[in-house]
Amino acid sequence: MKRILGTAIAALVVLLAFIAPAQAADLAHGGQVFSANCAACHLGGRNVVNPAKTLQKADLDQYGMASIEAITTQVTNGKGAMPAFGSKLSADDIADVASYVLDQSEKGWQG
C-alpha cells in the first residue's frame, strides 16, 4: 500500500511539474492576444465604451463574469457593444485571453 501511494505521489509531482510551465505560457500568450485584440477598449482593465463594466475583479464578480466560461462566451459571441471574436480568434486564443483577464483582475491589473 505504501509503495502504491508513493508511486502515485511521485507521478503527481511529475505531472504538476509539466502543468505549471504550460499555464505560464498560456498567460503570456493570453497577454499577447489581449494586447492585439482587447487593449484598445480594455487597457489596464478599463472599459472605454461602458466605464461601469470594467475588467476589475469587483465588476467581474458583480456582473457574473468572473469565470473562464463566462469570459470565453463573451469573447466568442460578443454582447452589446462588444464584438464577437469567435471567427477571428482560435478557441485556444480565447481560452488564453480569458485566463489572462482573470489573472490580471486578481492582481488589480498591476502586472
From Swiss-Prot:
This is Cytochrome c6. The gene is petJ. NCBIfam families: Cytc6PetJCyano (NF045930). Heme c binds at residues 38, 41-42, 82. Belongs to the cytochrome c family. PetJ subfamily. Functions as an electron carrier between membrane-bound cytochrome b6-f and photosystem I in oxygenic photosynthesis. Keywords: Electron transport, Heme, Iron, Metal-binding, Photosynthesis, Signal, Thylakoid, Transport. SUPFAM superfamilies: Cytochrome c. Binds 1 heme c group covalently per subunit. One of its GO terms (biological process) is photosynthesis. Residues 1-24 form the signal peptide. It comes from the Bacteria. It is found in: Cellular thylakoid lumen. Its main location: other. GO terms for molecular function: electron transfer activity; heme binding; iron ion binding. PROSITE patterns: CYTC. GO terms for cellular component: plasma membrane-derived thylakoid lumen. Monomer.
